[in-house]
Swiss-Prot record:
Pfam families, A to Z: HLH
Transmembrane segments: none
Main location as per UniProt: nucleus
GO molecular function: DNA-binding transcription factor activity, RNA polymerase II-specific; protein dimerization activity; RNA polymerase II transcription regulatory region sequence-specific DNA binding
Sufficient for transactivation activity: annotated segments: 163-193
Protein name listed in UniProt: Twist-related protein 1
UniProt subunit comment: Efficient DNA binding requires dimerization with another bHLH protein. Homodimer or heterodimer with E proteins such as TCF3. ID1 binds preferentially to TCF3 but does not interact efficiently with TWIST1 so ID1 levels control the amount of TCF3 available to dimerize with TWIST and thus determine the type of dimer formed.
Main function: Acts as a transcriptional regulator. Inhibits myogenesis by sequestrating E proteins, inhibiting trans-activation by MEF2, and inhibiting DNA-binding by MYOD1 through physical interaction. This interaction probably involves the basic domains of both proteins. Also represses expression of pro-inflammatory cytokines such as TNFA and IL1B. Regulates cranial suture patterning and fusion. Activates transcription as a heterodimer with E proteins. Regulates gene expression differentially, depending on dimer composition.
Composition skew (Low complexity), residue ranges: 1-18
Record-linked SMART domains: HLH
Subcellular location: Nucleus
Gene it is expressed from: TWIST1
One Gene Ontology term, aspect cellular component: nucleus
Ranges of residues in domain bHLH: 110-161
Organism, scientific name: Nomascus concolor
């Protein structure tokens, strides 16, 4: 019976069934390998994603730490930006002040010019007044009087005229002629002046 079974020919149907059963078994390992590869690749990709994500998270966490170098760099950058902004603001202020500086300079120049003009006018009028006073006051040829000396001499001349008016030495005829009276007063004042200067020098 054993020989009959072993030697019995296998029917084509049985062969096709056995082949069909073997084919899924043969096809399963590659699919399993592919699935394993896909799973491994997915795990690797997930792990890789988690890795950079973790690194990124660590970078962010490190940035939040007060003593981290990243925060120091960011602080420097922000400080640099702030300094640039302040510098820009300063530049803007400089431009505005620069726009106003020429106007103020022109105003100062105008004020200086006006002050110089007023000073020249005052000096000119003062010189003219002293020149007129020197024409009235009898002076000696050797006189080179300054302004203060001219004022002192004018005060002495007024004192001399007061003394002459108080005295009765001049008659009415001499007083009636203005030119002669002026020459007489001038000569008398010159003599009086010299005597006063001699007496003052002798007293000292």
């Amino acid at each position: 019976m054993m020989q009959d079974v072993s030697s019995s020919p296998v029917s084509p149907a049985d062969d096709s069934l056995s082949n069909s059963e073997e084919e899924p078994d043969r096809q399963q390992p590659p699919s399993g390998k592919r699935g394993g590869r896909k799973r491994r690749s997915s795990r690797r990709s997930a792990g890789g994603g988690a890795g950079p994500g973790g690194a990124a998270g660590g970078g962010v966490g490190g940035g939040d730490e007060p003593g981290s170098p990243a925060q120091g760099k960011r602080g420097k950058k922000s400080a640099g930006c702030g300094g640039g902004g302040s510098a820009g603001g300063g530049g803007g202020g400089g431009s505005s002040s620069g726009g106003g500086s020429p106007q103020s300079y022109e105003e100062l120049q105008t004020q200086r010019v006006m002050a110089n003009v007023r000073e020249r006018q005052r000096t000119q009028s003062l010189n003219e007044a002293f020149a007129a006073l020197r024409k009235i006051i009898p002076t000696l040829p050797s006189d080179k009087l300054s302004k203060i000396q001219t004022l002192k001499l004018a005060a002495r001349y007024i004192d001399f005229l007061y003394q002459v008016l108080q005295s009765d030495e001049l008659d009415s005829k001499m007083a009636s002629c203005s030119y002669v009276a002026h020459e007489r007063f001038s000569y008398a004042f010159s003599v009086w002046r010299m005597e006063g200067a001699w007496s003052m020098s002798a007293s000292h």
